[in-house]
Design a protein with these regions (language model features):
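Short proline/glycine-enriched turn/loop motifs at strand-loop junctions of beta-rich domains
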Residues: 425, 435-440, 511-517, 648-652
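Bacterial Sec-dependent N-terminal signal peptides
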Residues: 1-20
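Short, compositionally stereotyped local motifs that mark structural "simplifiers"
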Residues: 487-585, 596, 609-629, 656-658, ...
Length: 719
């Protein structure tokens, strides 16, 4: 008889094969993430290339960005390069990238022992150097720029894939769409995409058939330039990996966290995507590429990394942990040690991680403050005072602060709930708040496999743990208990809000699983068994905060009910058009480039430049970064209606219509799009957009969409 996982896998493959995807996000976003990836939870990122030769960056920076620093006047990298390599160019360093100690079978053995279920190797980073024999690389660069023709003179990607495929680990690859200084990219972007990027990607897919295709370097152009939708349609419909490949969301500026496959936060442990598959990546130190500047104390401890894995798994995500081999092909011993330590822990506790899903409650907090300001502690370079945010959140809190004392994961196939705790309680009692277990429920301790005694104390469950014995309890980075045949809960309802044509009041629909009952409130209070019963769509007459939850019709037990879904619902009022005398095309702008840090406070009455712009754009900036804009004028609306506005920016921005804030996309962040609505009468309306860039990459896009119409950038602007 076939096992259930095999049957699920076969069913999943049939479902994927039956679907034909169109080259648009609406269709592509419907492709489910392959089941194997959802079950895997832990992967290894590998950044390896010519940048391993210098293998250097100042602390708090990425060593794989070495070339970019050399060519953008990074004085620290330039000083290091001059001292070590003299007048040699970065391209000449490919001759020193020998990889003479690279043993792919040893790497594969290490990966399997680490407990990782997949790897993602950089087939090509932003410098354009490829780890496989790419004829496009040599052609567009005009010299040998791939590992088969220079340096190692071997197919590093192919050799590693062959070795990994002898193990239980899935083989995946990273691919940078963008190349910083590729001469073809700099002169003809469309030709670069059609004659370089696409042929390389198809070469990789057809010849290496990766289980993961992880793109990056997307920010410099929209998905339309990269022809990302067309490529994904081919990948999903026709490619040899159409049924198994996993992709991420880095397919063009503004796409990340909005479209594509899995969402891919990077050093963003606070981000959470409850309704979308995701994976957070990070290094063991800070750099992804090998950085000889980092010291032992710059690396996260094994406990910190195990807790990071637990944290991601408890919230339904995957953890992609990076290693950076050196130019000789050796993985630094400290990185090997960390991987083996994680593997040791997973050997004991892996069933609490693999094949699990997010439970209705992801963690349980102790008493205390939760307003941690958890920036990236590595950037300070002071491990003694910076601390480790994962450890502070769990085992080493600052005075007065709470910790996540319990994490929960759930295996739906087995109906088992796992409770993971990073700190062994002194009194050997584990308390699960707000849970009621059926009499006779079996609970076991994964470290020793022994059954545990428990009792129901009011609304809480108390579990008696064994005496802590280090001879029996190995790999004490965290501990787990299994609660058998318990944990199935009603799925959280989905709240859908629609505005019918010509209607400013929203229609509310709430969806949930068959066999469940939905109760909801419209005043922001938490719903309960006696709240309003949802039976059919309802029109909402005022601004409301809707909260809804579901529970099984034959069991309203709170611990098995769904988590609460919420939605802010607005009933809009018409905003009347303004009388504007002699409007002229274009919009006013004020430009700022202060000497100090840039934020919303930089926008004041003393601009560095003023003028008229054809559209709301940052193309008029006078320097690469650290600037701000203030746009003000009028927007012409052609007919009465409810309009959606979209504000996409890196960093912060705000949009106002008729002096009313419609969108607040403020703060320091990468490219993020937010939206808001306004009911506008035909005619002119004031529009005001403010924007700042605090440094690094920057972008701003303002779009409008009539109800039922097409989203497009705002063009009808006046002053």
């Amino acid at each position: 008889m076939r096992s259930l996982p095999a049957i699920y896998s076969l069913f999943f493959s049939i479902c994927l094969s039956a679907q034909t995807y169109q080259p648009n996000w609406e269709s592509l976003d419907n492709r489910p993430v392959p089941q194997w990836f959802k079950d895997a939870k832990f992967g290894i990122f590998i950044h390896w290339g010519v940048y391993a030769v210098p293998g250097w960056s100042s602390k708090g920076n990425y060593a794989e960005w070495y070339q970019n620093g050399l060519q953008t006047n990074d004085t620290a990298r330039m000083r290091f390069h001059k001292a070590k390599f003299g007048d040699r160019s970065y391209y000449d360093l490919a001759n020193d990238f020998k990889a003479e100690l690279f043993n792919p079978d040893d790497w594969a053995k290490l990966f399997e022992k680490s407990g990782a279920k997949y790897i993602v190797l950089t087939s090509k980073h932003h410098d354009g150097f490829t780890l496989w024999p790419s004829k496009e690389a040599d052609k567009t660069w005009g010299f040998k720029w791939n590992a088969a023709d220079i340096g190692p003179k071997r197919d590093l990607l192919g050799d590693l894939f062959k070795a990994v495929r002898k193990t239980s680990v899935h083989a995946g690859m990273y691919y940078s769409l963008y190349e910083w200084f590729n001469p073809l990219w700099k002169t003809d972007k469309q030709k670069f995409v059609t004659e370089h990027t696409w042929p390389q990607m198809k070469d990789l897919i057809n010849n290496y058939q990766p289980d993961v295709f992880w793109t990056d370097g997307d920010w410099d152009a929209p998905a339309e330039t990269w022809k990302s939708q067309e490529f994904l349609a081919w990948l999903y419909n026709e490619s040899p990996v159409k049924n198994k490949v996993v992709v991420n969301d880095r397919w063009g500026s503004g796409v990340r966290f909005n479209h594509g496959g899995i969402y891919s936060p990077e050093y963003q442990p606070d981000l959470d995507f409850e309704t979308h598959d995701w994976e957070e990546s990070r290094g063991m130190g800070y750099s992804y590429g090998y950085n000889r500047e980092e010291d032992a104390w710059d690396y996260n401890s094994a406990q910190s990394l195990v807790i990071a894995l637990i944290d991601k798994a408890s919230r339904g995500g995957n953890f992609l942990l990076d290693i950076g081999p050196d130019e000789h092909g050796k993985i630094p011993p400290i990185m090997q040690e960390r991987l083996l330590q994680i593997g040791e822990w997973l050997t004991i506790n892996g069933e609490a991680i693999y094949n699990t899903r997010r439970w209705k409650t992801t963690s349980q907090w102790s008493a205390g403050r939760r307003d941690y300001k958890g920036g990236n502690e590595h950037i300070t370079g002071d491990w003694k005072t910076g601390g480790d945010i994962m450890l502070k959140l769990t085992v080493d809190p600052d005075p007065g602060y709470a910790v996540k004392e319990l994490f929960f994961t759930y295996n739906p196939a087995q109906n088992n709930l796992y409770v993971i705790f990073p700190k062994y309680p002194d009194n050997r009692k584990l308390t699960i708040n707000n849970a009621e277990l059926p009499a006779g429920t079996k609970i076991s301790f994964l470290s020793t496999k022994e059954n545990l005694v428990w009792n129901q104390n009011g609304s809480n469950v108390e579990i008696n743990l064994p005496e802590f014995n280090p001879n029996k309890i190995k790999s004490p980075y965290a501990f787990a208990v299994k609660i058998e045949n318990f944990g199935k809960y009603a799925s959280r309802p989905q709240i859908k809000v629609e505005y019918m044509p010509g209607e400013l009041r929203p229609t509310l629909s709430i969806l949930s699983d068959a066999g469940t009952e939905i109760r909801y409130t419209d005043d922001g209070s938490d719903p309960g068994p006696n709240s309003a019963l949802y039976t059919a769509p309802v029109v909402i007459n005022k601004n409301s905060l809707i909260k809804a939850y579901s529970f099984f019709k034959n069991n309203s037990e709170k611990s098995l009910a769904s988590s609460v879904a919420l939605a802010e619902v607005k009933a809009y009022q018409w905003m009347n058009a303004l009388k504007v005398s002699g409007p002229k095309a274009a919009i006013n702008y004020r430009y700022y480039q202060p000497d100090a840090n840039v934020d919303m406070g930089s926008i004041n009455d003393k601009p560095d430049e003023t003028g008229i712009a054809d559209n709301i754009s940052i193309n008029l900036k006078k320097r690469k970064d650290k600037f701000a804009f203030d746009f003000s004028g009028y927007l012409k609306i052609e007919k009465d209606g409810l309009y959606s506005f979209y504000l996409e920016s890196d960093d912060g921005s705000q949009l106002f219509v008729d002096n009313k804030e419609i969108i607040n996309n403020g703060g320091y962040h990468g490219t993020v799009e937010k939206s808001g609505r306004a009911a506008l009468k035909k005619g002119f309306h004031k529009i005001h957009v403010v924007y700042f860039d605090a440094g690094g990459e920057n972008s701003l896009k303002v779009s409008i969409q009539p109800e039922g119409g097409i989203k497009q950038q705002i063009s009808a602007l006046f002053h």
